[in-house]
Amino acid sequence: MGTVSPELMARRGIIGALVGAVTLMLGGCNPFTNSASYRYRMTVEGTVEGSAVYEVLAEHTRTVILADEKPGGSMLRGEALVLRTASGPLFLLLKNKESTEGLFSAVTHALTPDIPAGGHDNFWKAVNRLGGWTANAKADLPREDWPLIVRFRDLNDPKSVEKVNPGAVGLKRIVVETTSDHVTTGIEERLGWLSSQQGSFVRRLSVPDPTNPPIAAILNKYDFSTEIGN
């Protein structure tokens, strides 16, 4: 690893001080960062139907000062979409087979197919467009990007969570579209234990094969909601 010269350290210190001073003067606003967001409604069609509203937020740093500084960040707000069935509720999580970022990136690309997928600059461009006043986008979410679906054998026992095959419960289509509606909340009314849950539902090291853990050892409360307390 190379060393940093005193001159460069001093320069970084001056830049940091200037950025900090400007940030304080603007009441906490970073003058080098833009933010954008949009909301979308996800609607499930099939034997069981339902919908929920989510919000995607993104930040874009206009001026990257340091080599290891990221060009921006992103996150998803919302809660698992709940579908009512005769055998109990199903939950479409805030992640697909990849991750939470995998889900909202897939939704964003489905709504802006003309913008190439991948890379923060492309993602920022898409979110910025979808958050505009005239945004009116609607699309089918490809099946390979669908959220993970789970149910609980016992709603009062997080360890009883199990994965559900969408075809087995009659899910045929998922549609996403931009909206100005409020983000869906209220999942704690169904899962009263969720807000106090710490870590994964089952400790990963406690399962027979930690390299191939059950879904209960992978999931945590933030896969169900971003709107509950820590």
Question: What would you call each of these model-derived segments?
Answer:
Residues 34-46:
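Alpha-helical transmembrane signal-anchor/signal-peptide segments
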Residues 1, 9-15:
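N-terminal export leaders
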Residues 153-230:
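Glycine-rich, aromatic-bearing surface loops/beta-hairpins
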Residues 18-24:
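Hydrophobic helical h-region of N-terminal Sec-dependent signal peptides
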Residues 49-160:
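Structured domain cores in non-transmembrane regions
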Residues 26-28:
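C-terminal motif of bacterial Sec signal peptides marking the signal peptidase cleavage site
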Residues 30-32:
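Bacterial signal peptide processing site
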